[in-house]
Amino acid sequence: MAIVVRLDDLLYERRMTLTELAERIDITLANLSILKTGKARAIRFSTLEAICQVLQCQPGDLLEFQPYLGEA
């Protein structure tokens, strides 16, 4: 299974840069970049809440579950 982070899509739809989001939620650009590229192993609920508040979205808009092919 894989969790896909749709941050790029949400930023594009809202015409916002990653840098602007990082400043607005007070997180380093490096950490937000790790999340955006799907390399993060975890996300704090406080960070998820801040992202959702700024982007006016739900957690399910940001994170998507995609099962690997062949999994039942």
Q: Where are the model-predicted features located?
A:
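Residues within the helices of the helix-turn-helix
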Residues: 8, 19, 49
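Residue-level recognition of specific faces of alpha-helices
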Residues: 31-34, 47, 61
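Short, charged recognition helix plus adjacent turn
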Residues: 34, 41, 53, 63-72
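Alpha-helical residues within the helix-turn-helix
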Residues: 12, 23, 53
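Short, basic-rich loop-to-helix N-cap that marks the start of a DNA-contacting helix
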Residues: 39-50
